[in-house]
Amino acid sequence: QGAEINVDDYINFLNEYDEGVEICCQWDTIPVGVEPEVASQQTWDNYWYMRERLKSPEKLLYVFHEGEDYKWLEKALQHDEITYIALGGVAKKPFKIRDKFFETCFEIISKVKPTVKTHAFGMTNRKLLEKYPFTSADSTSWMYPAKFGTIQWGDWKIVNVSERQVESPDHVYN
């Protein structure tokens, strides 16, 4: 985020490690600080630019972001080549916004191309993962508890493991 990376360098990297890559994300433009229509067009153009240059273009995920016009999602779903999409731009958005975004996306998907695979980008909220038929998901939220000396234990329970918090009622030794 915020780093300058060359799209051709990214393509070369993906081609070099193609055998070890199951799926990969396209070079996208998130509509933050950029007009959504401009971001959508850049994302669309970058998808096809990358697809033409990858050893395994079928591994490339098209990315549709919260805040973009849903016509871009519909457009992507109408292409036979696009079999796996990522739904993103929701990482720091409130639950209600994410829920409404996914609800609308999956309504469109069910009408246009119900067989498309979907990836939740930057989102591993359990309620949303159980509510919508995602194929895959990712986020960095699993790392945050460790910053505070806690870990996830079993079925989503957070327990304290910090030596500084031994007296805490949620400490693993208590």
Which residues are covered by each model-predicted region?
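Short amphipathic alpha-helical segments and helix-helix/interface helices
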Residues: 11-14, 44-52, 73-77, 102-110, ...
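Glycine/Thr-rich beta-alpha phosphate-binding loop at enzyme active sites
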Residues: 28-38, 59-125, 141-167
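Non-catalytic, usually N-terminal nucleic-acid engagement modules in DNA/RNA processing proteins
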Residues: 1-48, 52-55, 133
